[in-house]
Amino acid sequence: MYRLTDRNRAIGEMFSSIAPRYDFLNRLLSLGVDRRWRRLAVAETVPSTGGRFLDVATGTADMALEISRQKGAGASVAGVDLSVEMMRVGQEKCARAGQSKSVAFLRAPGECLPFRDASFDSACVAFGIRNVADRERGLREMCRAVRPGGRVVVLEFSSPPGTFFGALYRFYFESVLPRIGGIFSRGSAYAYLPESVLAFPEPPAFAEMMRTAGCASVTHRPLTFGIVTLYVGVR
């Protein structure tokens, strides 16, 4: 039995407060590159067509919709999140895309997924594992929910190496991004973002965390000069 922590509740409330502008700000602040990152992540899941997929921290369903697009009519997606408002936006997007029947939404924390063992072919989480209060438990839950031979795919922000680009990006990430985000949204969500990324483990350490949780053959590769890292594990 898992009880929501104060941090769980705070994260859910924070994202609910920015839900109406979340997609707009994502496109603006990433210059649209986030769509490519999601395409690459979904391409790592199995099977290539059809299948059952779990999307943890589904939010406004960008990842769930990309799964439906790549995997075709035979695929089904279960999206879980703590923010009802974010999922409401996601449901509206799925309806507009004609995917209401293929994507189901459930309110649940990543630390306690309401599914039986081996229920899915693959599980993924995009830019959400940072926000899981008990990260190790969340990874174990994803592994538990995936069948043997399935994939666990994590897409997450990372800190670029200490190059000129890395220094430039860090300035943008820590100083510019929160200001732009603050103009279009209330609250501290875009101040929280750089803080949470800087506190996140380095890629080799997080890959080891995935192995400890139950993933085998874990790989990780940087995308867009290391702004984001794509992690893939086999259950």
Regions found by a protein language model. Name each.
Residues R52-C112:
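Class I SAM-dependent methyltransferase SAM/SAH-binding core
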Residues A213-R235:
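Core SAM-dependent methyltransferase catalytic element
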Residues E111-S122:
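A short acidic, Gly/Pro-enriched loop at the edge of an enzyme's catalytic core
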Residues R9, L155-M209, A213, T219:
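C-terminal alpha-helical "lid/dimerization" subdomain adjacent to the S-adenosyl-L-methionine
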Residues R21, L31-G51, E66:
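Conserved alpha-helix/loop element of class I SAM-dependent methyltransferases that forms part
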Residues E136-R151:
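A short glycine-rich, Lys/Arg-flanked "PGG" loop and its adjoining helix->strand segment in the class I
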